[in-house]
Each structure stands twice: as structure tokens, then as C-alpha cells.
Regions:
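Glycine-rich beta-solenoid repeat tracts in large extracellular/virion proteins
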Residues: 92-95, 112-113, 135-140, 183-189, ...
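Hydrophobic transmembrane alpha-helix bundles
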Residues: 86, 116-128, 248, 269, ...
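A short, flexible beta-alpha/helix-coil linker loop
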Residues: 53-56, 266-268, 357-359
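Extracellular "leader-to-stem" segments immediately downstream of a signal peptide or signal-anchor
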Residues: 2-5, 11, 16-82, 87-189, ...
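Short charge-dense sequence patches
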Residues: 19-25, 98, 168-172, 201, ...
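Folded extracytoplasmic luminal domains of secretory or organellar precursors
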Residues: 57-64, 73, 82, 97-99, ...
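Right-handed parallel beta-helix
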Residues: 105-106, 143-152, 191-202, 214-227, ...
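A generic structural signal for residues located within well-ordered alpha-helices
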Residues: 61-64, 334, 372
Length: 432
């Protein structure tokens, strides 16, 4: 009898999941609940870097030896590059089709703190396609690429961070790219990507940048960059840039910038640039957040985002829960957003304001209106300083927002409902 009851429960659960839909009403594909971690036994031959001349030495630069192992695996039809227990120092590495990265428990791939050890390549950063420094780990046009294991990829960013803040003291308006520094992970133009189990820490710049990729899973990652004693500037945990079908699940994220940021392009004609585009069908679930600037951020270099879900997450001491960055120099449209089943705390619950850092209309006189619509926040138990940190603007329109079943404890619980057109409330408690 108990067995039958269990089967019935499982059946109901599967039926419930099968009925799940994205905010615009389209069904959520079964792919989003297939969360098995990749088995490296299925990925081809194994290439342990110490079998090919690399040595456990945190002070010895070994970029060429590690890259040679990647190239050898590629020449032989693919396989898994294994980082064994120990610390291995490297500059930029480039993975090839059918190659993978596996870090054993106790293994550390450590980035060089000398920028000259990173190649200058055609890449993508901050909503622009340009020449800049490669990341520590790069994979372009590598369908099926995986990073897995229980080891660590350490960006070794402290020297870069200190140099950035020193530059800011001398040149207050310097850009994020003016202080030359690499990202930790950059994956582009690839499908069916999985990153699982590994610690990504201390990135000099963005931690995990995914550009023009479809069907990407980030499972059980630990992503960290400090806010004290030295702030890690622009150390976003995950930047999704023109991506479709992405699952971020069971991850820990604590960085000195946005935890998950949706990118896609910037500038007055950003929506016309073929290198730019939108993000769609993104689910972030069952994650835990430490300090970050925002749990989920739209922008600042973003054009179009649709069907974005943040759910079943715990957030501690963030600056914001949901942040919509509205750039007055970029046409933007954010729609069909769902934030639900969240607990925790942040300075601001909802934050929507014009974002004018490095503002440049480039001479355009007829800048189009930007929009954010069909945003739902529900089933949330949250503590914050400011509940509704939203500003009016003649440069964007906000409409069709829903607040449902909220239990909010806020120092400032005021809400100007007139800012949003068709703003629906149901069972919202603020300081009750």
C-alpha cells in the first residue's frame, strides 16, 4: 500500500512538472529536469596533465604544457583533460572540439596574475565584440563541452583587484576594461554545455561568461569572489549573453557584483547589431546566495530578455533581490519574468532605475522607449531596507506587474503603485 502511495505521489509530481510553463505560457521542456552530472567515462580518453610534463608547482607557469595536452587530445579525437591533486599555474587555455576539463578533488588550476600571460583575441565583453584578453579557460564552438569534478579554478585575482581600485583613485571615470584583466571562464558559440561541481573563485573580472550558447546547465557550482578586505570588482558569478535554454541549479554564489546578470549588447543601435541579441528560457533554481549586488540583474548591457525564472532560492545580505537596469542609451525590453519562493534579505526588494554609467547616445536623436512588462513576484518571505526602490522615467515604461503572497519586513515599506501601469496586488503584507 505504501509503495502504491509512493508511486501515486511520484506520478502526481511528474504530472505537475509536466504542466509547468514559462511566464508567457509556453511549456517548460523536460530537458530542464534532466540534471544528471556528466560521467567522464563516457567522454573519451583521459589525459592527466602530469603524465605529459606538468608538475605540481604553484609558482611555475605551465600554460604551454597544459595547452599541449589539450591539443593532443583534440588531435586524437577528443577526451578529458584531467587536473590532478595539486596546484598548476597557467595563462589562457583554449579547449577544442570534443575536449573536456575535469578537476580532481584537491586540484587547483590557478590563473597567472601577470596579464601578459593571457592572449589578446577577438572576444566579447560588456556588450561589445572586440579584441580583449582571453579568459583563463576558453571554449569556442565546442559543442558538448563540460567542466566537472570537485576541484577549483582559482583566478588569483587579488593583484588585479588592487590595481583596479588604485587606477580608480587616479582616474575616477576609468572603465571596467581599462584595468587589463582576464575573466575566469568564457564559453561561446557552443551548445549542450555542462559545468558541474567545481569551485570557481577569485576571478579578476567576470567569473563565468556564456555567449551565444544554447542548452547550458550549471549544476552544483560554488562561485565566490570577496567583498572584503579587497573588493573583487565586476566579479559577476554568471553572465548570460545572448543565450537560450539555461538552467542554473543548486549553486552557491557570493561575489562583489551581480550573481546572475543577463547581457546582450549596449548602445543606441544595439538591437540592430548582429553580434547582439536576447536571452530566453532561463531558470535559476534551488540556489543559495551570499553577498552580491543582486540576485538577478537585467543589464546593464542588455537588449531583450524573455521567460526568466528565479525560484526556490535563499538570499543572504544581497544589495538587491531583483534589479532591472534601464539604460537610457540602449533600447531594452524585459518581459515575462517570474521570481517566486524566495527567502532571505537584501537592501532592496525590487530596484528599477535609469542606469547611466558610461552613458553615450552616439549622436542618436530618436532614442526609442524601453519597456519592462509581465513581471511577477510571489510567495516570498523577505527582509529588506527598501521594499519598492523604483523611479519614474520618461525613457521607459513599466506595466503588468503582479505582487502575490508576499511577507515583507522593510525599514521603508512605501510603494508608489502609480509608477507601474496595471499593477496587481494580492495577499501582500508589508510590516504586518
Amino acid at each position: 500500500m505504501k509503495f502504491i502511495a509512493l508511486l501515486f505521489t511520484v506520478f502526481i509530481s511528474l504530472q505537475t512538472f509536466g504542466q509547468e510553463k514559462f511566464p508567457d505560457g509556453t511549456p517548460i521542456p523536460d530537458w530542464f529536469r534532466q540534471n544528471n552530472i556528466v560521467n567522464i567515462e563516457t567522454l573519451g580518453g583521459k589525459y592527466q596533465i602530469t603524465d605529459y610534463g606538468a608538475v605540481n608547482d604553484s609558482t611555475l607557469l605551465q600554460t604551454e604544457k597544459i595547452q599541449a595536452v589539450i591539443d593532443l587530445a583534440s588531435q586524437k579525437g577528443g577526451g578529458v583533460i584531467i587536473i590532478p591533486k595539486g596546484t598548476f599555474l597557467s595563462g589562457s587555455l583554449f579547449f577544442k572540439p570534443r575536449t573536456h576539463l575535469y578537476l580532481e578533488e584537491g586540484a587547483m588550476l590557478k590563473g597567472s596574475d601577470d596579464i601578459s600571460n593571457f592572449a589578446i583575441v577577438d572576444t566579447r565583453i560588456e556588450g561589445q565584440s572586440l579584441k580583449y584578453f582571453a579568459a583563463l579557460v576558453n571554449a569556442d564552438r565546442v559543442d558538448g563541452f563540460t567542466i566537472s569534478g570537485k576541484g577549483t579554478i582559482n583566478g588569483n585575482g587579488e593583484r588585479y583587484w588592487k590595481s583596479f581600485w588604485l587606477r580608480r583613485k587616479v582616474i575616477p571615470k576609468c572603465t571596467n576594461m581599462d584595468e587589463l584583466r582576464p575573466r575566469l571562464i568564457y564559453i561561446s558559440n557552443s551548445n549542450d554545455v555542462q559545468l558541474s561541481g567545481v569551485h570557481f573563485i577569485n576571478s579578476p573580472f567576470w567569473t563565468t561568461h556564456i555567449y551565444r550558447c544554447n542548452n547550458v546547465k550549471l549544476l552544483g557550482l560554488h562561485i565566490f569572489a570577496p567583498s572584503v578586505p579587497v573588493k573583487a570588482p565586476s566579479s559577476d558569478a554568471v553572465d548570460l549573453d545572448v543565450c537560450k535554454n539555461v538552467l542554473i541549479k543548486n549553486c552557491y554564489m557570493s561575489v562583489n557584483d551581480d550573481a546572475v546578470a543577463l547581457k546582450g549588447g549596449k548602445g543606441p543601435w544595439a538591437d540592430k547589431d548582429p553580434n547582439n541579441g536576447g536571452n530566453s528560457n532561463i531558470i535559476i533554481e534551488d540556489c543559495t546566495y551570499g553577498f552580491c549586488h543582486s540576485g538577478l540583474t537585467f543589464g546593464s548591457e542588455s537588449v531583450y530578455n524573455r521567460n526568466i525564472i528565479l525560484r526556490r532560492c535563499k538570499i543572504s545580505n544581497a544589495s538587491r533581490l531583483l534589479w532591472l537596469k534601464m539604460r537610457p542609451d540602449t533600447p531594452q525590453h524585459y518581459e515575462y519574468i517570474l521570481v517566486e519562493d524566495i527567502t532571505g534579505s537584501a537592501k532592496s526588494f525590487l530596484y528599477i532605475k535609469p542606469w547611466t554609467q558610461f552613458f553615450d547616445l552616439k549622436g542618436r536623436k530618436d532614442m526609442p522607449m524601453s519597456y519592462s512588462n509581465n513581471v511577477t513576484m510571489r510567495n516570498i518571505d523577505f527582509k529588506c531596507d527598501v521594499f519598492f526602490n523604483v523611479s519614474r522615467s520618461d525613457q521607459y515604461q513599466l506595466k503588468d506587474f503582479t505582487f502575490e503572497n508576499l511577507n515583507i519586513r522593510a525599514k521603508d515599506g512605501k510603494c508608489d503603485k502609480e509608477i507601474i501601469s496595471n499593477f496587481k496586488w494580492d495577499k501582500v503584507k508589508v510590516n504586518n
